[in-house]
Structures are given as C-alpha cells and as structure tokens.
C-alpha cells in the first residue's frame, strides 16, 4: 500500500513539473507592456544589463523597427543606449540612440551619437537613415527607446551594442561602469528566418550618412541566438526526468 502511494505521489510530481516547464522557459520580454507601441514580431532577453529588445524586420523597405528596454544604472539621472555598429562588433564605431530622463515628469530625451572612439561621445548624425525616434518611461524605472532604422538591402543581421550609464550633466551623459557586463554588452542580432545564428556580419565600410529622423564569436554562448537551444534543453531535461520517474514506477 505504501509503495502504491509513493508511486502515485511521484507521478503527481512529474505531471506538475511537465505543466510548469513552459512557464520556466518563457522569455521575460514577452510579458512586457510597451504602452502605446504596437506589437513586434520578435523579442529577445539580452544576456546582460537586464535589457530587452523587441523588433520587427520589414523586407519590403529593408527596415528594422525596434524597442529597446533597460534600466539606467542610477535611479535619478541615468541613461540607456542601444546602437548598431556597421563597421565592428563593439562600442567604437557604434551609431547609438541614447535616452535619459530630463525631470519634471516629461518623456525621456533621446539623442543620437556617432561613437568614433572609446574616448569620444559626441552628439551627431548617424551613418544610416532612421525615423519615428522617441522614448518612454516604463514601470520599474525602465526606459524604452523606439525607432525604425534602415538596414542594407539583403542583410539578415546587424551588430548590436547596448549600454546603461550613470549621471547626465547639462545634457551630456556620464561614463558608464566598466564591469564585465558593461564590457560584454554586444551581440549579433539576426532578424530573418534564414539568418544563421552564429554568423556575425563582416565589418566593412559604413554606409554614407543619411538624414536623421524627427523629434538591437558571432553570438556568444548564452546570448540571444542561443535562447531557442536553452529552451529546448530545459524541456528535454524535464521530459527525460518524467520518463525515468514513470519507468521506476512500473519496475518497482
């Protein structure tokens, strides 16, 4: 009788685990409310800095609409930034959108920066066209940057860089921290179904500067490109455990 009760208990636990496993593997970005923004086709939990990217690729005009969500490193006066690097994989050469709160309950200010070197952070035009640029304050102290950028025709991925920083003085952002996460906040963003997750775009010449509009080893381990593999591994491990438990019931 005791053996039968133990078997039933094990079976009940196994069924419970199988039911909750999809919730365990679900991406956090899918539950985010982006206020007035429409739905995006895809989203990624970026691997560092508690940051998220929502995006939609439009092949008809080679554009990428994005919403970048992050929390500044300081509750008051901090900034967040998302960039595309047409010529490399890290910060130098990045074409960045940077947002910060100006105070008084107003919407965050968002500016563009052409980052020519690690020691230079000067506001200026970007090397590609963009439009519909804006920023919003979200719950939990987060800031969201929205924009649509022009990407090269036929491209299936871009090098994205993101960052969070501290104080902003007279509209000029301060230096960001130099911890491992801050230095590792760059990944390849593959935005078409045919893109190979591990292949980084080859650095080349930046496109000719466009007009700004009005007012996201290849992908490293643990990065956005491996999210699907992680989910599959979690579910496979759970299902294998269930099979082992069920087998033990019938054997004993």
Swiss-Prot record:
Record GO biological process: auxin-activated signaling pathway
Membrane topology, as annotated: Lipid-anchor; GPI-anchor
Domain DOMON: 49-165
Signal peptide positions (record): 1-25
Positions that bind heme: 91, 176
Top-rank taxon, per record: Eukaryota
Cofactor(s) needed by this chain: heme
UniProt keywords, alphabetically: Auxin signaling pathway, Cell membrane, Electron transport, Glycoprotein, GPI-anchor, Heme, Iron, Lipoprotein, Membrane, Metal-binding, Signal, Transport
Glycosylation (residues): 58, 61, 114, 167
Chief site of localization: membrane
Pfam hit, one: DUF568
InterPro entries: AIR12_DOMON, DOMON_domain
Molecular function per GO: metal ion binding
Bias kind Low complexity: ranges: 195-219
Annotated region (Disordered), positions in chain: 193-224
Lipidation (GPI-anchor amidated asparagine): 226
Residue numbers covered by the propeptide annotation in the UniProt entry: 227-252
Subcellular location: Cell membrane
Induction (free text): Induced between 4 and 8 hours after treatment with auxin and remains high for at least 24 hours.
GO cellular component: plasma membrane; side of membrane
Cofactor binding, per record: Binds 1 heme group non-covalently.
Described function: One-heme-containing cytochrome.
UniProt remark on domains: DOMON domain could bind one heme b.
Name of the protein in its database record: Auxin-induced in root cultures protein 12
Organism: Arabidopsis thaliana
Underlying gene: AIR12
């Amino acid at each position: 009788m005791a053996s039968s009760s133990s078997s039933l208990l094990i079976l009940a636990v196994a069924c419970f685990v199988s039911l909750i496993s999809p919730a365990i593997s679900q991406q956090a970005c899918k539950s985010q409310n982006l206020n007035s923004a429409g739905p995006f086709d895809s989203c990624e939990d970026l691997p560092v800095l508690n940051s998220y990217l929502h995006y939609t690729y439009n092949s008809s005009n080679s554009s990428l609409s994005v919403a970048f969500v992050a929390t500044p490193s300081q509750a008051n006066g901090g900034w967040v930034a998302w960039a595309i690097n047409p010529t490399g994989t890290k910060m130098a050469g990045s074409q960045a959108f940077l947002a910060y709160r100006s105070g008084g309950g107003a919407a965050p200010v968002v500016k563009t920066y052409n980052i020519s070197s690690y020691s230079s952070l000067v506001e200026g035009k970007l090397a590609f066209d963009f439009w519909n640029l804006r920023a919003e304050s979200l719950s939990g102290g987060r800031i969201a940057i929205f924009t649509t950028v022009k990407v090269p025709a036929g491209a299936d991925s871009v090098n994205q860089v993101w960052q969070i920083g501290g104080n902003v003085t007279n509209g000029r952002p301060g230096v960001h921290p130099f911890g491992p996460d801050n230095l590792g906040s760059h990944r390849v963003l593959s935005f078409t179904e045919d893109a190979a997750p591990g292949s980084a775009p080859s650095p080349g010449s930046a496109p000719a500067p466009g007009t700004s509009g009005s007012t996201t080893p290849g992908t490293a381990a643990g990065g956005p490109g491996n999210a699907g593999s992680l989910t599959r591994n979690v579910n496979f491990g759970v299902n294998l455990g269930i099979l082992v438990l069920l087998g033990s019931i019938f054997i004993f």
